[in-house]
Swiss-Prot record:
Belongs to the GppA/Ppx family. GppA subfamily. PANTHER family: EXOPOLYPHOSPHATASE, RETROGRADE REGULATION PROTEIN 2. It catalyses: guanosine 3'-diphosphate 5'-triphosphate + H2O = guanosine 3',5'-bis(diphosphate) + phosphate + H(+). Keywords: Hydrolase. InterPro entries: ATPase_NBD, GppA/Ppx_hydrolase, Guo-5TP_3DP_PyrP, Ppx_GppA_C, Ppx_GppA_N, PyroPPase_GppA_Ppx. The keyword Transmembrane helix does not apply. One of its GO terms (molecular function) is guanosine-5'-triphosphate,3'-diphosphate diphosphatase activity. GO terms for biological process: guanosine pentaphosphate catabolic process; guanosine tetraphosphate biosynthetic process; nucleobase-containing small molecule interconversion. The lineage of its organism: Bacteria, Pseudomonadati, Pseudomonadota, Gammaproteobacteria, Enterobacterales. This is Guanosine-5'-triphosphate,3'-diphosphate pyrophosphatase. NCBIfam families: PRK11031.1. Its EC number is 3.6.1.40. CDD domains: ASKHA_NBD_EcGppA-like. Pathway: Purine metabolism; ppGpp biosynthesis; ppGpp from GTP: step 2/2.
């Protein structure tokens, strides 16, 4: 099917640090990204003390928009939204910049209020991020920071604060010195900005905290590169601050996983985030799946926010790769029953059980490529697909489980993922393998009543009397599975 211009949508965000363009098309109630262009314009750096935007900064912005304009020519105007944020809200001569910007792009540019920006960010998060739906969303931009609480699709409080990674860089790291004093000043200033809104945020409360900005993205990249789990904590932020202080100067800042492009505004963003964690007593934060641009796009498409984003993602993937959903359900029921039977001994957390059920939903997707090496194909697809609702570490765990669903077990891959502890990954893998094995006849009426018990790492399977005698192929498969598990010292006893 040819993609026509009318099925395309574009969202452009003229931020204080970067200009971004996102071009998508709608597919099965979700969006498929076709183009993402990002240019570091650092508009906020061109803002003088009396809030005049310098000609040089304006020219950098216009130059970037000329690139964007070429891509917009094929998209209907009513399917394009261009918004400008903090710096253009502040600049007294923003009218001059916007007039030329509209001429270049051939469509209107809307300067949105801080509250509207916060609302759109929240919508972008609600459409793309899994987990508990009572959340606090934090987005540190170039010149403003948005803090939003909400439940499901509904924001309950919206705040846009005048601090950002570019303005804090210019204000507190002017000498490009990464000294403790600079960090202290930057953090204290951020705390002052936060104090007036803290009580209101706490009043609404949240169960999970998600970050939706370049600073949080950079932290995620650092943690993945260093083999840590993906949860951002105050201890990790303090550790990274000490590393930055050791580097001494901004131009010498070297942290494994931190790209050169993000390095310039990383210390200032880090200082703001440390202040937010300390003042709001945040225990842990994860990266959001989308923010402002996604909020704009979903708004144009008028798509309702699904309560369970992961379920929507799994359904879309199953449809796309022609997965036998009845078989996936059968395997999921068995895996769920096994997990419940081991509730007291292995005590899998709800999130771990969810990820096990997600692996069951996708375990046969590799068959759409070829039966041979189907688990390898499935793992590759999961690693490389965009899966809204799943974090990068969760995707890696799913891929690892799918890779190890049959035949030999690659223990090192289960230990290299960092979504769950290695021992939990082993437990999930064992339950998935057994569920697949016992559902192999692909019929509900042939699922045996299996009793599963665990003592430490030793698993005991109790089958109905005469089951092994009446099912020679099944007995052979269980014997083979016993061998595979014993190779990695997983004790499996069959009664």
């Amino acid at each position: 099917m040819m993609i026509t211009g009318s099925s395309l949508y574009a969202a452009i965000d003229l931020g204080s640090n970067s200009f971004h363009m996102l071009v998508v098309r709608e597919v099965a109630g979700s969006i498929q990204t076709l183009t993402r262009i990002k240019r570091k314009v650092r508009l906020a750096a061109g803002l003088s003390q009396d809030n005049h935007l310098s000609p040089e900064a304006m020219e950098r912005g216009w130059q970037c928009l000329r690139l964007f304009a070429e891509r917009l020519q094929d998209i209907p105007h009513n399917q394009i939204r261009v918004v400008a944020t903090a710096t253009l809200r502040l600049a007294v001569n923003s009218v001059d910049f916007i007039a030329k910007a509209q001429e270049i792009l051939g469509c209107p540019v809307q300067v949105i209020s801080g509250e509207e920006e916060a609302r759109l960010i929240y919508q972008g998060v609600a459409h793309t991020t899994g987990g508990d739906d009572r959340r606090l969303v934090v987005d540190i931009g170039g010149a403003s920071t948005e803090l939003v609480t909400g439940t499901g699709a509904q924001a309950t409080s919206l705040f846009s604060l005048s601090m950002g990674c570019v303005t804090w860089l210019e204000r507190y790291f002017t000498d490009r010195n990464l000294a403790q004093e600079n960090f202290d000043e930057a953090e204290n200033a951020a705390r002052e900005v936060l104090r007036p809104v803290m009580d209101k945020l706490r009043y609404h409360g949240w169960k999970v905290c998600v970050g939706a900005s370049g600073t949080v993205q950079a932290l995620q990249e650092i943690m993945m590169a260093q083999g840590m789990d993906e949860r951002i904590t105050l201890a990790k932020l303090q550790q990274l601050k000490q590393r930055a202080i050791q580097c001494g100067r901004l131009e010498e800042l070297e942290i494994e996983g931190l790209t050169l492009e993000r390095a310039l505004v990383f210390p200032s963003g880090l200082a703001i985030l440390i202040a937010i964690f300390s003042e709001l007593d945040i225990h842990c934060m994860t990266l959001a799946g989308g923010a402002l641009r996604e909020g704009l796009v979903y708004g144009m498409l008028h798509l309702a926010v699904e309560q369970d984003i992961r379920s929507r993602t799994l359904r879309n993937v199953q449809r796309r790769f022609i997965v036998d959903t009845e078989q996936a359900q059968r395997v999921a029921q068995l895996a769920s029953s096994f997990a419940n039977q081991l509730k007291t001994t292995w005590a899998l957390e709800p999130l771990s059980q969810d990820l096990l059920i997600s692996a069951c939903a996708l375990h046969e997707m590799g068959l759409s490529i070829d039966f041979k090496q189907a688990p390898i194909h499935a793992a590759y697809l999961v690693r490389n697909l965009d899966l809204p609702g799943f974090t990068p570490a969760q995707k890696k765990l799913l891929a690892t489980l799918l890779l190890n669903q049959t035949n030999t077990v690659d223990l090192s891959s289960l230990h290299q993922q960092n979504a769950v502890p290695p021992r939990v990954a082993e437990h999930l893998c064992r339950l998935l393998r057994l569920a697949i094995l016992f559902a192999s006849r692909r019929r509900d009426d042939l699922l045996p009543a299996i009793k599963l018990e665990a003592e430490g790492e030793n698993l005991t399977l109790t089958l109905p009397e005469d089951w092994l005698d009446n099912h020679p192929l099944g007995a052979e498969m269980i014997e083979q599975e016993y061998q595979w598990q014993s190779y990695v010292h997983w004790a499996l006893e069959v009664k």
